[in-house]
Amino acid sequence: MCGVVGISGKSSVNLRLYDALTMLQHRGQDAAGIVTESGGELHQCKGEGLARDVFRRSHMMRLVGDVGIGHVRYPTAGSSGPALAQPLYVNSPYGIFVAHNGNLTNADELRQQVFRDDLRHLNTDSDSEVLLNIFAHELQAQGKLAPSSDDIFAAVSGVHERCKGAYAVVGLIANYGMFAFRDRFGIRPLCFGKRETAKGTEYAVVSESVVLDSLGFELIRDLQPGEALFVDELGVLHLHQCAKEHQLMPCIFEHVYFARPDSLIDDISVYKCRLRMGEKLADKLIRLKPDHGIDVVIPIPDTSRVSAQALAERLGVKLREGFMKNRYIGRTFIMPGQTERKKSVRQKLNAVKLEFAGKNVLLVDDSIVRGTTSQEIIQMAR
């Protein structure tokens, strides 16, 4: 899980990219990066940590340009370290940066292909670098001195043919524009919007629609599975379906946990989805145990709160805040290591004993991944 953003604007985009990354921070806390372009020159700043810690005033002043992309990273594939911070760069052809959210399931096979057949060197164990080099090879194979939108889309089609798994990508080609594409199953989210200015139309591509709302862009729609977008150097938008076969099969965890509740993903409200999850859970509980005897419903902060509220209303019992959250601790799911996750749960949450003493309590969480959080929370509740 990562967060990506790209903006093709009519004025400086550095601060807007930074703001976008802070709004996507829940999608990754390991590293952050921004790349901008001005007059063919690419300007980059990236590093480990939260966006607020990576970017300083001096960095922002150097990130000049009207077009740029950004990334916040949670390492699902590859090790951690500053070399893995995105966007990632390849010099040939043209000079290309990409920011990738997803996982390639055939990354090991592709690494061998990239080295043996494409004659390209990979410097990290990141599957994002694999995807970048495959896109670059497919674009170079078009054999053009200056790539057109058709060349970009042909390269994306080549990626679809070779890459298996999940990928939502935004990229930047020096002197030529910004591109974005989504895997043929639409596993990871990607939407785009526009903003009218006195100088012309600006476009933004983001992981979650909430970023468009905050930056003043009008949501156009989600990129379809297999679809690609290209905004050329003149600011003209091009769209094309690049996959021969495509079907929407999104990751359910986006609506359950990853996304902010105020986002729309594939035209579905995350907030409304979580409300309905709570209602369905309540209906099942009533069906299986009508004499449940529950005194209070307590959500595990923060993602489960919407579902817990709907569940409590359906059951006709009180909703109480039984855990206080330290908001300076990150999301435990995206902590890089089991020991860190267990330690983080105790630092992150503290039980309000008054809400548990002598009561039959129903705890509501959005999901169980490793069980680390659940074990620690039950111990605290007892």
Segments the model singles out, each with a brief description of its role:
Residues I134-D150, P301, Q309-R331:
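Amphipathic alpha-helical
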